[in-house]
Regions:
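Flavin-dependent oxidoreductase catalytic cores
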Residues: 2-275
Length: 275
């Protein structure tokens, strides 16, 4: 179960009582859209609203929201949870210098910008225990206007802090997952391995061959797949027998119904397996 808060990547139409979305600072995301339901009953993507900055005394309440979400997940039977601190959503917005312009204890230095995300992690650990909690991060990502002046330093700091807490895993998204030329700096993966004692997972634009190579480098323990898994419900088996993959239909992403999510076919039972 993944726990997340989108922060400024939202709109007043989907907020309680039509309130503004919240963020570390009142900066609107660039080119950001969210899925909303319109007055005529239809639904679709819509540009996000300008957020308001969270008051300092509101932040503990959001930490408590995460704690309660973890408690509900546990009662529902989920074995573990992943804290989503990636993809330009709320926790990522606090970590990055371009979206966090605060002057209180939640802004400025590395330690201050990481304070809220780590408070969330601690709250979730209180519910599940550290060995049942992971976190997803996207250092170096540039999305919806989110930028960071010191992404490597923040990634290293977070890795060290999470390692001290005994977190089960750290899940890192490749910065070029949506295209582009941004990559991790030389030596970054090795440094993350040194700083984090739990399992490391990478994801984003991988295929089977590239995933095997990455694991062989000993810089990661696993590679995760998202979009290929949506379009290929039997993805591990396709990898095992070297079968062709179905390409996902991007037009159905965030569509709000089953089309493009649960209607992709499994392999033909007669597929000639390649050993």
């Amino acid at each position: 179960m993944q726990l997340w808060h989108v922060g400024r990547v939202s709109h007043e139409m989907v907020q309680p009582d039509g309130q503004q979305p919240v963020a570390p600072s009142a900066l609107k995301g660039e080119g950001a859209q969210c899925f909303v339901e319109f007055e005529d009953g239809t639904a679709g993507q819509h540009p996000t609203s300008t957020p308001r900055a969270l008051e300092t005394d509101e932040i503990p309440g959001i930490v408590e929201d995460y704690r309660q979400a973890a408690e509900r997940a546990k009662r529902a039977g989920f074995d573990m949870v992943e804290v989503h601190a990636a993809n330009a959503y709320l926790l990522n917005q606090f970590l990055a210098t371009g979206t966090n312009k605060r002057t209180d204890q939640y802004g400025g230095s590395l330690e201050n910008r990481a304070r809220f995300p780590l408070e969330v992690v601690d709250a979730v650990i209180d519910v599940y225990g550290a060995d049942r909690v992971g976190i997803r991060m996207t250092p170096f990502i540039e999305l919806f206007g989110l930028t960071d002046d010191e992404p490597e330093a923040m990634a290293f700091y977070m890795a060290e802090q999470l390692s001290k807490r005994g977190l089960a895993y750290l899940h890192l998204n490749e910065p070029n997952w949506a295209g582009g030329d941004i990559t991790f700096p030389d030596g970054f993966r090795e440094q993350m391995r040194e700083r984090f004692s739990g399992s490391l997972i990478y994801c984003g634009n991988y295929d089977a061959e590239r995933a095997e190579a990455r694991i062989g480098e000993n810089t990661t323990d696993a590679v995760a797949f998202g979009r290929p898994y949506i379009a290929n419900p039997d993805l591990p088996e396709r990898f095992r027998v070297n079968a062709p993959l179905t390409e996902p239909n991007h037009e159905t992403f965030y569509g709000g119904d089953e089309k493009g999510y649960t209607d992709y076919p499994f392999m033909d039972n007669g597929y000639d397996r390649i050993q």
